[in-house]
Amino acid sequence: MQGRLSVWLVKHGLVHRSLGFDYQGIETLQIKPEDWHSIAVILYVYGYNYLRSQCAYDVAPGGLLASVYHLTRIEYGVDQPEEVCIKVFAPRSNPRIPSVFWVWKSSDFQERESYDMLGISYENHPRLKRILMPESWIGWPLRKDYIAPNFYEIQDAH
């Protein structure tokens, strides 16, 4: 079953895959990494001008990595927001997804955290570097195949 946004995207020839609806009735769409930036700009112009959150997760050990965007469109009033969830999957061997920083500035720290924890490289992000872990940290702690080091260096909080 396709939702309103999916029907609109099909009508305008924009490639995507409908993943159905979540428990709150929010439509979920899958977009290919190579199509994501242009579709993000189109969604912004269409009225999805609020990025509620961006997160990422490891789908399965050795499998794909996912970057998830929750967008909101307020057209008819604050009490009737239209929401959509976008998922962009990337191979773990070279996880590259276009950054949407220039579309939604609020994605700045969120994309950096996804990079820091899962190693997803957000192309054209102006400051893509670690945000939680030290720059010297090796590996991506939230990947399911991550092997934690057997020691941790404790640093002073000065």
From Swiss-Prot:
Assigned EC number: 7.1.1.-
Entry membrane topology: Peripheral membrane protein
Cited InterPro entries: NADH_DH_suC (IPR010218), NADH_quin_OxRdtase_su_C/D-like (IPR037232), NADH_UbQ_OxRdtase_30kDa_su (IPR001268), NADH_UbQ_OxRdtase_CS (IPR020396)
Keywords from the named record: Chloroplast, Membrane, NAD, NADP, Plastid, Plastoquinone, Quinone, Thylakoid, Translocase, Transport
Cellular component per GO, a single term: chloroplast thylakoid membrane
Pfam families (UniProt xref): Complex1_30kDa
Main localization, broad class: plastid
MF GO annotations: NADH dehydrogenase (ubiquinone) activity; quinone binding
Source organism, top-level taxon: Eukaryota
Subunit structure: NDH is composed of at least 16 different subunits, 5 of which are encoded in the nucleus.
Described purpose of this protein according to its UniProt entry: NDH shuttles electrons from NAD(P)H:plastoquinone, via FMN and iron-sulfur (Fe-S) centers, to quinones in the photosynthetic chain and possibly in a chloroplast respiratory chain. The immediate electron acceptor for the enzyme in this species is believed to be plastoquinone. Couples the redox reaction to proton translocation, and thus conserves the redox energy in a proton gradient.
Similarity comment text for this entry: Belongs to the complex I 30 kDa subunit family.
Protein name per the record: NAD(P)H-quinone oxidoreductase subunit J, chloroplastic
Gene encoding the protein: ndhJ
